[in-house]
Amino acid sequence: MLLLAASAAGYAQKPRPEKLDRGLVVARGNADGSYFASWRLLATDSPSISFTLLRDGKPVKENITGATSTAVEGKPTSRWQIVSLRDGTAIDTTKAVLPWQQPYLRYHLQKPSAGKDYDYTPNDCSTGDVDGDGQYEIIVKWEPTNAHDNSQDGMTGPVFLDCYKLDMTVPANDPKRLWRIDLGPNIRAGAHYTQFLVYDFDGDGRSELMCKTAPGSRDGRGNYVNQASDSKDIRLADNGRDWRNSRGRVNGGQEYLTVFDGEDGHAINTIYYMPNRNTGYGRDAPGTFQWEPKSRSGDNGDNGNRGERYLAAVAYLNGFDKAPCAIFTRGYYTQAFAWAVTFDGKRLHTNWFHESRDKEQYSVTDSLGRKNTYNAPAPTSGSGSGTLFANGNHNLSIADVDGDGRDEMLWGAAALDDNGKILYSTGYGHGDAMHVADLIPENAGLEVFDVHEKKKEYAWDIHDAATGRIILKGGPEGIDNGRGLAAQIDSTTGAFYFWSAGDSDIRSAADGKVVSGIRLPINFRIYWDGDAQDELLDGVNIRKWNAGGSKLLGIFGDVDNERKRTLTARNGATGSPMAKGLRSFQRPSLSFNGYGNPASNNWTKNTPCLQADLFGDWREEVVYRDRDDNSTIYIYTTEIPTAYRYPTLMHDHVYRMGIVWQNVAYNQPPHLGVNLPKEIKSSRSANY
């Protein structure tokens, strides 16, 4: 068994990890009535820390120094605890938890009342510790069934945000709801509108929630959010007015940003959202601004497409020893704006405001209101936009890519430095998906795999996350490449591979060579079965790449009888470890069907409500809605043993920021800021 301590490189120059408890969970086994216990190792733990597992107050396994999970025997009424020991002396004992009685947790939620022609389903979720007890809560976005994409007309029902307790001490089917926020009629429902951030913004140990609001939005106490403003104009706005036009577009009225208390949901502070739909500040802002270039047909606020595309993230822009910033953006097909905001516990403040109104110049307004205009650097590809203009994706990522102790914002085909200035642009234009990780261990730092929707010369590229230097580029010319994935599917090499919808060949991130023509899922990656490689999460199935060809997953379901997909070897791949893995790939390797009635979200995106390391050891949990009962969600956790002891993924900064932005627009999976197989190889081994 391998003992993995967090490497100094992996956790240096990062924020202080959030305070979490051991996250002990005990779930019923698949068939024989046994249980599987799993708990957190923290990045702050000493490498010599050990654990004792208690059942009904008596030791079951003592001085555990290996993996923080184990199979155990018990009863449905057994109460379990973890004792943490330093040099053999107990330093902490967890609260007692009751076991799950299935290999999953079923939560019955309080669904909002249906409207005249629509109902509600749980959609994107997020997580944060809203009450400071070291346990995560879950925040659920309720999506009306008449939600629309920005390209579509139509009325929608209001969006609701709920917060529920995740209390593992008594895993009841009916969790306690802490609050509900009603965003009202003037926030349209759809994937591109409500991007909500759950994080501890003021450093008090409790998470807040931030999102875009409007007149008519109500907080967790039922009060209108505009009453939490210092602005008289905002407080006097008409909360009874419906600003939607006959096409269902919200083309007028004030637009706000509100920060909500995480524990009871009350609105703490509301300010004008920057920019408004006319790219100005405040007031009712009737939609007249042309978001398309003059050479094309107009897209103003009445049409509500280009100017209603939002993204959001959390980033440590002022240093990891300072409070984090919320970043809210508007537009990416053409004009693009990014607004960094801080929260001091009482008020929201602008950190900086970035404007990319064309391809050659951009401006940044600082916290004191001083605006400076800059010429953009030349795109690293040699052509295209040099600013955020037309270079954004339907998603974004956050990481300290240049090692200065401050985060940068990865925009797709461009990046912003911590001060709001352009770090670089590749010029490759708009894309649907991207992945930021240590894709190429031989290249210092992180890399970006970007999938291009813009019909240009290349369908994808990999570029250096710090400099924008193009490392690889390729794929069919002139296509709309809608989706792609980069993952470490072969732990024997520790290498990343990538593939996409428009270029399904599997390629090595190291050199771009095709290793197979087999088609793999292009949705999420996940750590599930306990090795150091990624599994592939697609809908409610986890698909497994078995490099040795010796094992298939079956803990949650039988392996599909579909014929094995045989490798079409190219570029000398025959006989390589990768090729052997391809030969043994079967699908699906694991299905959640039969364990509850789970369903994925967001149409062809096939995404879960949430994927995150919510509790237990370093493997990830998955949250799904019920296929038929719109009041129910499921939380699944792995019960497969692992040989590795590793800190909770939530203490990896890049990963934690990824959980915050996961709900944004076209959801993307989180990645680590370190190369996990490389971390394992560099860690000391021990025989346990």
What function would you assign to each model-found segment?
Residues L3-A6, V26, T350:
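Generic detector of low-complexity/intrinsically disordered segments
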